[in-house]
Amino acid sequence: MKRYEVEGHVPSYLPEDKEWKLVWHDEFDGPDLDREKWDFRLNFWGKPFDAYTDQGIVFDGKSNIELHRSVRNGCYVSPQLQTGSNSFDIPKDVSSVKNPWGQDDIWPLGELSKPKFMHRFGYYECRCRFQKDPARMWSAFWTQAPGIGTTYDPAWSGIESDIMECFLVDEATTGNIMGGYGKQFRNEGRVSYPLKKTPDGYHVFGMDWSEKGYVFYCDGEVVSATSENVSMVPQFILLTTEVRGYRSSTPEKVEGEFVDDAFIVDYVRVFDAV
């Protein structure tokens, strides 16, 4: 991997077979979330999702953002950040009962908003420290296409690229999902692997996405690669946490003393090959 200097911050380490330029990044210098770059993900499949919140964001003053879990209605919740949105997440405005032709509004999607950042190809990198108890709150760094699963060929409707997911202590999962989230769901290059100890507890995850395929990295080493079903459309970035229980309708209630936990991120960077 080749060293790429970022003034005032730790460097990136990028694949050596290409020259790179930095095209988008957030170093999380604070003191507040940069709303020109990020939105909160608050909806899931067309309605507000009880697991998500716009609370729990903390800047530590050392160029880190912390995504903390918090409490709402007696249950744990946690934040998700995104630079765009899945078209199917957005709730439909039920007050708009007629379409432009005076008919009942049959369009299934809500009103789409302009994304903060969408990009195609390049190297996507995140440096982070994991939460203490990932079995109760997992974390992820990933990209997704707004129309995933809407065409037979994922090249033209995009995919989900999980650059990193953390469900278990000292383990990460990496790989792609395509075909949507129903009967045609499938995955490629998806692997789980143990994390090696680092001196400061931080890990660096990266994805080199090109017309030829995907190569995934953890701490400078290749952990997975695939050349099948390459997305040819721009995708948005997500930096997320999620507490357990909501997808099975049994969210974890706060019993006794509240237990804090946080996913800590140093930076997110996107590079283009030149």
Regions found by a protein language model. Name each.
Residues 1-274:
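GH16 jelly-roll
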